[in-house]
Structure formats: structure tokens, C-alpha cells
């Protein structure tokens, strides 16, 4: 997995790992629906990786003075784009088509909770926590796919992605705590987890999307 699945070089404490708990697991029926829509799931997954890469580029260009952030996110950009290519290759191998990118209801709803009138550092914190949350939910969904798909190759394929996303979401929390007080980060993270739980309850269950 070296070279394909990057794990952050920063030391991530057990304390950080322990706070990263989604409050609501995915509905078990989701993976059953996803089995029936592999082309749509792989297409959506490819665009999730593309958006992750471009968002990391945006974070770097908006925060060039944050040296540690630049150092840690630069390899993530390369990795996420590599993931995009891997998923597209999987589509081609199966003689499936990369469809058009669709509106991401999950992410758009997360953005509604982002502080619009806070200080620059408050807005930065929310950007980091949104990324952490997206990676955490992706990790959870990839775990579902790695356990619930009929295709053994795809189960292993998604297990590798699950391991990668686990390293990513802890990285965003660790970076946030590097630049802001840990108590502030933990408090806001708890608020985000509560909001995401509510969001997951309200969203329509769909098998054609990763989120």
C-alpha cells in the first residue's frame, strides 16, 4: 500500500483517535442498495476522491503561511488524485462508464452548518472539521462495502480505501489542534458530530452515493 495509500507523518495520539466517533452508523440497508448500483457508486466514489484532492489544494493555497498544513496536505493531494485514477480504472476494467458528477447533498448540507460570520480561525476550524467528518463518514461507508459486497475483489479494494480514510480524518483533527486550542477543537467537533447525526437521520437512503 505504500505509495498508494498515504498515512500522515504526524504522530496521532490515542486521545485524538478516541474522540472520532460518528454518532449514527449507516443504515445496514445502504450496502444492499449499493450492490445493485455499482456503476453509480464507483462514479460517485471517483468524484469524491477528485473533490478531496481539489479541497486540499484549496486549503493549501488559502493557508500558505501554515507550514505544517502545507507539508501534510501536499502528499494527500497526490494520493487522492491517485485514488481517483484507481476508481476510474476499476470502472473501465468492468466495462462501466464514469458518469457525470452530481450534486453532493451530504456535503452541501454540512456546509449549511459552517460558521459564516466567525473569525478567520473559526472558519478555518470548520473547514478542517468538515474535511474530518467527510473522511470519517467515507471510512465508515467503505467499511460497509468491504464487508457487504458480493465481489471479493471489491471487498478488498474498499478495505484499502477504508484504511486510508481512517488516516485522513485523524490528520485533519490533529492539524486543527496544532493551530487552535484543543478544548475549542473538541467542543466544535462535538457540535459537528451532533449535527451530522441529525443530518443522517433526515437524508433519504440512497444506494447510488457514497454519502
Q: Which role fits each region the language model picked out?
A:
Residues 1-9:
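N-terminal amphipathic/basic-hydrophobic helices that include classical n-h-c signal peptides
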Residues 10-211:
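Non-heme di-metal
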Amino acid at each position: 500500500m505504500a505509495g498508494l495509500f498515504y498515512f500522515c507523518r504526524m504522530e496521532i495520539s490515542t486521545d485524538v483517535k478516541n474522540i472520532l466517533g460518528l454518532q449514527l452508523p449507516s443504515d445496514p440497508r445502504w450496502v444492499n442498495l449499493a450492490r445493485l448500483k455499482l456503476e453509480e457508486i464507483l462514479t460517485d466514489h471517483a468524484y469524491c476522491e477528485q473533490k478531496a484532492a481539489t479541497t486540499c489544494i484549496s486549503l493549501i493555497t488559502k493557508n500558505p503561511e501554515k507550514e505544517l498544513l502545507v507539508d501534510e496536505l501536499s502528499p494527500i493531494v497526490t494520493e487522492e488524485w491517485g485514488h481517483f485514477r484507481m476508481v476510474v480504472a476499476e470502472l473501465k476494467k468492468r466495462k462501466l462508464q464514469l458518469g457525470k458528477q452530481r450534486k453532493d447533498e451530504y456535503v452541501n448540507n454540512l456546509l449549511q452548518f459552517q460558521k459564516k460570520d466567525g473569525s478567520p480561525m473559526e472558519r478555518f476550524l470548520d473547514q478542517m472539521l468538515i474535511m474530518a467528518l467527510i473522511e470519517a463518514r467515507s471510512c465508515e461507508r467503505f467499511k460497509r462495502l468491504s464487508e457487504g459486497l458480493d465481489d471479493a475483489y471489491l471487498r478488498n479494494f474498499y478495505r484499502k480505501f477504508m484504511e486510508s480514510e481512517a488516516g485522513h480524518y485523524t490528520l485533519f483533527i490533529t492539524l486543527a489542534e496544532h493551530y487552535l486550542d484543543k478544548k475549542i477543537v473538541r467542543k466544535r467537533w462535538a457540535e459537528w458530530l451532533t449535527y451530522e447525526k441529525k443530518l443522517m437521520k433526515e437524508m433519504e437512503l440512497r444506494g447510488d452515493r457514497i454519502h
